[in-house]
């Protein structure tokens, strides 16, 4: 057994010859950006694959978050989770809004609907939950609260590509959902992202906002930005869409092996599949109980690293611990006990389509032995 580096993720790459052939067509057309044919085709193909009405492509996964808040004219306070990647909360801050942190449900890692109402004030205008690790939020519980108080709901669905609940896309929940197509994700366009909306009017507004606010050659209808996806990455995305199902199934098989081996290891827990959910196996987080396992999370993380097996403490530290946000009242430790416990115990194991049986076994040997 060799000692090659096992990475926590690996990008899904289209066949290079196939991609080169598409690049040749783009070169010949000389249309490399600005809503070209590949861009249009990818939006249509993604809407069909994801079972959603409208898709708007972006150049990365952060800009859809920023633009969604603009599109819905969100002001004041936005309720969100501290247990996420920093882009979630940064998008709120960049829009001049105040993030209000609410604790998570330890059973899922997602925003706990039972704790949302207590955080609502007269300045609250929206809720921004995250489908953490691609595990669906309690969308009904969240929507019931949003409807009661007249709040908008924007889902950060960066991890939730292709996830369904009882045959329905999780991306259809809320007012808007956003996706990341970063190289680390299940489906990628190198860098990229998308926004999912439910009606043509919102789709049109989003498309204006991501193109400087232009509604025509000489008409600007609002203060937009430039966040369009180019033709090269659109072509790359179309090719990757053809192989993403096989990649997800390969991840599924890795998850099965991890669960079989780790289920009897005292002090190590993990999430099982949720009933009725079509998962995408974006990540495989484990949680270390130091007292039962006999080793802290950080000690296990270091042991793995020494063996050339890279895990990721994802999400540690909490967003609420960063200097920009730690002074917020809602960032207080006593307000977020479940989130702190999860952040202090998590390691995401290597999880991607290219892991071999030997890679999986080396990873497990670090933990089981």
Question: Which residues are covered by each model-predicted region?
Answer:
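Active-site PLP attachment segment
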Residues: 172-208, 231-234
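Structural detector of well-ordered beta-strand residues that form the stable sheet scaffold
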Residues: 56, 79, 100, 153-154, ...
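Phosphate-binding glycine-rich loop
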Residues: 31, 35-77, 83, 91-94, ...
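PLP-dependent aminotransferase class I/II
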Residues: 37-45, 49-55, 114, 118, ...
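N-terminal "arm"/small-domain region of PLP-dependent enzymes with the aminotransferase-like
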Residues: 1-32, 350
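PLP-dependent aminotransferase-like
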Residues: 70-157, 164
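Conserved active-site segment immediately N-terminal to the catalytic lysine
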Residues: 155-189, 216-221
């Amino acid at each position: 057994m060799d000692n090659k580096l096992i990475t926590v993720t690996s990008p899904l790459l289209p066949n290079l010859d196939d991609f080169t052939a598409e690049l040749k067509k783009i070169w010949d057309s000389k249309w490399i950006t600005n809503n070209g044919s590949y861009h249009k085709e990818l939006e249509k193909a993604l809407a069909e694959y994801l079972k959603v009405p409208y898709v708007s492509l972006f150049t990365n996964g952060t800009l859809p978050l920023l633009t969604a808040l603009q599109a819905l004219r969100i002001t004041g306070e936005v309720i969100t989770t501290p247990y996420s990647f920093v882009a979630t909360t940064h998008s709120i801050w960049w829009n001049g809004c105040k993030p209000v942190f609410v604790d998570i449900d330890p059973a899922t890692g997602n925003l706990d609907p039972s704790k949302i109402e207590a955080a609502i004030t007269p300045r609250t205008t929206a809720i921004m939950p995250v489908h953490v690790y691609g595990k669906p939020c309690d969308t009904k519980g969240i929507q019931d609260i949003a409807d009661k108080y007249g709040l908008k709901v924007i889902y950060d669905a960066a991890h939730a590509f292709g996830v369904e609940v009882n045959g329905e896309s999780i991306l259809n929940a809320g007012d808007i959902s956003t996706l990341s197509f970063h190289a680390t994700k299940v489906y990628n366009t190198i860098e990229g992202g998308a926004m999912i909306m439910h009606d043509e009017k919102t789709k049109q507004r989003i498309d204006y906002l991501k193109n400087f606010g232009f509604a025509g050659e000489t008409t600007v209808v609002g203060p937009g930005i430039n966040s369009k996806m180019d033709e090269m990455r659109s072509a790359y995305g179309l090719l990757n869409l053809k192989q993403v199902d096989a990649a997800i199934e390969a991840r599924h098989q890795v998850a099965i092996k991890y669960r079989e081996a780790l289920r009897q290891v005292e002090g190590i827990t993990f999430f099982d599949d949720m009933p009725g959910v079509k998962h995408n196996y974006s990540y495989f987080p484990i949680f270390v109980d130091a007292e039962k396992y006999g080793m802290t999370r950080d000690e296990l993380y270091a042991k793995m690293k020494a063996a050339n097996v890279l895990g990721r403490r994802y999400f540690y530290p909490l967003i609420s611990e960063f200097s920009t946000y730690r002074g917020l009242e809602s960032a207080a430790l006593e307000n977020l006990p479940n989130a702190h416990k999860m952040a202090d115990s998590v390691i995401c194991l290597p999880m991607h389509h290219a892991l071999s049986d030997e890679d999986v076994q080396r990873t497990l040997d670090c933990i089981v032995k």
